[in-house]
Amino acid sequence: MFRIVNGEDYSPAVQQRNSLDFGKAPSLLWTDHGGSNDRCETGGNGRESGQDRVKRPMNAFIVWSRDQRRKVALENPQMQNSEISKRLGYDWKMLTEAEKQPFFEEAQRLRAMHRDKYPGYKYRPRRKAKRSQKLLPADSSVLCSRMHIEETLYPFTYKDGCAKATRSRMESRLSRSQPTNTTSSLLPQEHRSSWTSLSHNRVT
């Protein structure tokens, strides 16, 4: 079931040593597959340094994908790591249960050895840092302030609780500015008529 390929020993004993020495040789394992959830874990409160962290034991997919990933990467040097992961995930699903069985057995053996070596180990997934501010659809105060600035320049669609107040404020402002606008619009006409009459008197 396990053989030497390209000068590398893939026996169960060597694989176990590689899995437990992951911190010393991280290139031996590939754990970036989205479905594997094989992330760095700790046996304590999650605040230990990188050297004290205990890795999860490899699952069947990781046991299988180590050699396959190296093979695909050599055959397709231009392929991105994410694309390799997608391809490996698809190929793994295409395997029959009989083909997967040896890797499940090896993963079970690795879990037993991991349990003996770290009896107090508990899986603690890392939590993503919460965003300080959640993205919400148009806050009322922000919307009102934007409308207050832009209401005289751009047409605006009113939303939320500030719509009525802003509309009434705009109407009152327009009603106050309308006479001024009318007067200002008449001034150029009166000025032109006065200039025309003055020019006519000079000619006559």
UniProtKB/Swiss-Prot annotation:
DNA-binding annotation, residue ranges on this chain: 54-122
Transmembrane segments: none
Segments of skewed composition (Polar residues): 175-187, 194-204
Subcellular location: Nucleus speckle; Cytoplasm; Nucleus
Region called Disordered, residue ranges: 32-52, 169-204
GO biological process, one term: sex differentiation
Post-translational modification comment from the UniProt entry: Acetylation of Lys-130 contributes to its nuclear localization and enhances its interaction with KPNB1. Deacetylated by HDAC3.
GO CC, alphabetical: cytoplasm; nuclear speck; nucleus
One Gene Ontology molecular-function label: DNA-binding transcription activator activity, RNA polymerase II-specific
Entry keywords, A to Z: Acetylation, Activator, Calmodulin-binding, Cytoplasm, Differentiation, DNA-binding, Nucleus, Repressor, Sexual differentiation, Transcription, Transcription regulation
Superkingdom of source: Eukaryota
Function noted in UniProt: Transcriptional regulator that controls a genetic switch in male development. It is necessary and sufficient for initiating male sex determination by directing the development of supporting cell precursors (pre-Sertoli cells) as Sertoli rather than granulosa cells. Involved in different aspects of gene regulation including promoter activation or repression. Binds to the DNA consensus sequence 5'-[AT]AACAA[AT]-3'. SRY HMG box recognizes DNA by partial intercalation in the minor groove and promotes DNA bending. Also involved in pre-mRNA splicing.
Family the entry assigns: Belongs to the SRY family.
Quaternary structure and partners: Interacts with CALM, EP300, HDAC3, KPNB1, ZNF208 isoform KRAB-O, PARP1, SLC9A3R2 and WT1. The interaction with EP300 modulates its DNA-binding activity. The interaction with KPNB1 is sensitive to dissociation by Ran in the GTP-bound form. Interaction with PARP1 impaired its DNA-binding activity.
Name this polypeptide is given: Sex-determining region Y protein
Native species: Balaenoptera physalus (Fin whale)
Lineage, opening ranks: Eukaryota, Metazoa, Chordata, Craniata, Vertebrata
Underlying gene: SRY
